[in-house]
Amino acid sequence: MKRGLLDTYTREVGRLNTGGEPDFTRMKQLGEAQQRAYNEIMFSFLKKNVVLLHGVTSSGKTEIYIHLIKQAIESHKQVLYLLPEIALTVQITERLRRVFGGKLGIYHSRYSDNERVEIWRKQLSAAPYDVILGARSAVLLPFARLGLVIVDEEHEQSFKQQDPAPRYHARSTAIMLAQMTGAKTLLGTATPSLESYHSAQTGKYGLVRLAQRYKGIELPEIRIVDVKDLRRRKMMKGPLSPLLMAKVREAVEGGRQAILFQNRRGFAPMVECRQCGWVPRCERCDVSLTLHRRTNKMTCHYCGAAYDVPQVCPACGSRELHTRGAGTEKIEDRVCDAFPEARVARMDLDTTRTNGAYERIIDDFAEGRTDILIGTQMIGKGLDFDRVSVVGILDADSMMNYPDFRAYEQAFMMMAQVSGRAGRKGGRGLVILQTKSPDAPLLDYVVRNDYGALYRELIAERQAFRYPPYTHLTYIYMKHRDETVVDHAANEMGSMLRRWFGDRVLGPDRPAVARVKTLCIRKIVLKLELGIDMAKVRQYLRAAQKAMADDPRFRSVQTYFDVDPM
C-alpha cells in the first residue's frame, strides 16, 4: 500500500443472500389440469379478492403458484408467499430460487434478529424483494406494491400465533393486508378449513378445484387395520401391525421408502405403577410426564421441566413401573430392531432443535439416504418425496378422540395430508391406517378422500350448535397461582359478561389442562352471532378486563382474550 501497488476501500456486505438473476426458462410447463386451474384463478380474481384453490395432494399446486408469482412480478407487483411451517421453506426455497434468483427473500423465526432486521430494512428500501417466502410472521413485513398473497396449506393451525401475544391468525391477517393494499389472496390446500370452504360455497370467496394428481398419478390406496382385534387374537404386540411390517419390508427391499406417522413425541406418554396405578405428574402443571429415553428423563411438554426417572413407586414402594403408549422414540427403537438393515430417521421437535437439523433430515430422505422416516405432524405438511410407497398412520384414534369441536376436522386433515405423501412419482402408494375403531364414519371419509361428505356432516353440526363459521368465538382466559382466587375472579367475570351478553356466555369452566407453569386456569366462552357490532364487543371486554384489574381482590389475576381460537 505504501508503494501504491494495493488500494484499500470499504464496502458494506449484508447477511442476505443476494442470489442471481431470475431465470423464467427454468419454470416447468403446466399440465392441462394445472393450466385450466391457473386460468380459472385468474378469471376468479376479476370478480373476487380471495380465491380458494382446492387441489388434491400432489396435484402440482406449487407450480401454479410459481406461474402466478411470475405474472405478478411482470406486472411490477410484490408477492407474499406464506407457509405454516419453517420445515416447508426448506424444500420450496430452492425451487423458487432457481426461477426467481435474487428477487426472492426468506423470512422466519429461525433467522437471527439481525438477519430479520436486514430483511425488514430491505423491504423499506428502494429495491425491496419482489417475493417474500416465510412463515406466519412474514405477514407483518412492509410491502410497497403488494399484488398477490399466497397462503399455502391454509388449513394449518400453525398459522395461529398463540403465545406470546400478539395473538393473530396469519391467514386472516394476510386477507386483511391484501384488502388494505388492493392485492389478491389465494388460499391453497388439499383439505380446506371449514371456514374457508364455507366462504367459497356461499360465494364470498372464489373456488377453483384441481381434482387430479400431477401426471395422472393415482391417489394412494388406504387400508384400515383393526389393531384391537389383532391384539385380542395376540397377532400384534408392538406398535406396528403385521401388514404394516410386511409392507415396510417390501418397500425397503425394493429400494423404496416408508413414512411412519405418530403424532406424539418422546418414548412413552406415561409411566405407571402396576401395583397401585401411580403416575408421575409435573409439579408445575396438571399433566403426566412423558418419558424420553434418549435423555433418560421424564419431561413436561407444557413447561419443559425435566425429572429423574423413578426406580421405585413413591406411593407403594413397588419396583413394577412400566410405560404406557408409544411416542416417536419408541417407534424408532422398534423399527430399528425389526429392520436392522434399514436407514432410519426421526423427525420431531426433539430432533430438529439444532440449527440445520430440519434441512439435514429432509434432504437425506429426499435424496434416498434414509429408508424409513418416523415423525410427528411435521411430516404431513406439504413435503414432497418421490420414492415413498408406504405410509403408516399408527394411531388414528388419538386424533379423533380429542375434546374439541374441531377434532374430526383436524383428524381428517392430518390423515389426508399424511396419506398424500405416498405414491408421488413411482406408482400408486399404500397407506396403512391403524385404529381401534374401524367403523368410525370419519375413517370412511378418509378412505374415499371424500372431503365433501365430511364438510356436509360437520357444517350441519356447527350450525345446530352455534359454532364457527356461524358464530364468532372468543375465549376469555384467567390465570392465577391461587385456585380460590382465580375461581372467584372467573365467576365475577362470568356474571359481568352475562349482564351484557346473556346466554352467549358459557362458563367459567376448567380447561382440559387446568394448571400450567404453576398458574391455575379458568376459561369463559363467548359465542357471538355474525353481524354483531365487534367494536362494541371489544369495548365491553376491555371494560370488564379493567374492572377486574381495578378490584383489589383480583388485581394480580391475568386476563386475556383469544379471538377466533384454534
Q: What do the PLM-derived regions correspond to, one by one?
A:
Residues 512-515, 549-550:
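Short proline/glycine-enriched turn/loop segments at secondary-structure junctions
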Residues 481, 525-534:
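A short interface-forming secondary-structure element
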Residues 23-26, 515-527, 561-566:
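Short, low-order "capping/linker" segments at domain edges
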Residues 25-31, 35, 47-130, 134-487, ...:
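Inter-lobe coupling/hinge segments of SF2-like helicase ATPases
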Residues 489-495, 535-547:
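Short amphipathic alpha-helices in soluble, non-transmembrane regions
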Residues 500-511, 553-562:
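Short beta-strand elements
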Residues 1-20:
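Interdomain "pre-motor" coupling segment immediately N-terminal to P-loop NTPase/helicase cores
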Residues 38-39:
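Hydrophobic residues on short alpha-helical segments
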